[in-house]
């Protein structure tokens, strides 16, 4: 796949990244913007929730472990505002995601997570995979 094709992939797609690590949100947003996505970021879950625009984002990427409100709580609140929004989780611990999913979020696909740390090519691949999944 050439770079021009990769840059066109994200055109017209809007992403929201919510993670309490500012460096991570900057790196991810720059990488995804390079590939043509429009990206908004927040480093605070409550601020993200209050600024969330229903029917606007094609994909929301949430960190799981955040202060104030964790990613699963934020997921619930976002779904109340926009039940159709696609959400995936960003986590350093696949095991933590899987345990929590089995315990309280059975309906979540076990593949709706992106593992930290991640390089730009893997990030693009995972975002495209999740966005095209049913």
Language-model segments: what does each one mean?
Residues 66:
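Receiver (REC) domain active-site loop signature in two-component systems and cognate sites
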Residues 41-59:
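Acidic, metal-coordinating helix/loop segments flanking the phosphotransfer/catalytic sites
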Residues 90-92:
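Hydrophobic/aromatic residues positioned on beta-strands within the core alpha/beta folds
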Residues 43-44, 70-74:
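Acidic catalytic/metal-coordinating carboxylates
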Residues 19, 63:
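Active-site residues of response regulator receiver
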Residues 73, 94-115, 121, 125:
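Alpha4 helix (beta4-alpha4-beta5 surface) of REC/receiver domains from two-component response regulators
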Residues 22-40, 108:
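Two-component/phosphorelay signaling modules centered on CheY-like receiver
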Residues 1-14, 119-134:
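Non-catalytic signal-transmission and effector/linker regions of two-component phosphorelay proteins
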């Amino acid at each position: 796949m050439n770079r021009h094709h990769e840059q066109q992939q994200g055109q017209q797609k809007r992403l929201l990244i919510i993670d309490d690590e500012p460096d991570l949100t900057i790196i991810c947003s720059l990488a995804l913007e390079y590939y043509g996505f429009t990206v908004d970021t927040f480093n605070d879950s409550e601020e993200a929730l209050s600024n969330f625009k229903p029917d606007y984002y094609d994909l929301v990427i949430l960190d799981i472990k955040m202060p104030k409100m964790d990613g699963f709580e934020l997921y619930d609140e976002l779904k109340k505002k926009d039940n159709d929004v696609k959400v995936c989780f960003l986590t350093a611990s696949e095991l933590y995601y899987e345990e929590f999913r089995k315990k309280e979020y059975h309906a979540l696909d076990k593949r709706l997570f992106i593992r930290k740390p991640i390089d730009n090519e893997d990030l693009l691949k995972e975002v495209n995979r999740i966005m095209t999944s049913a």
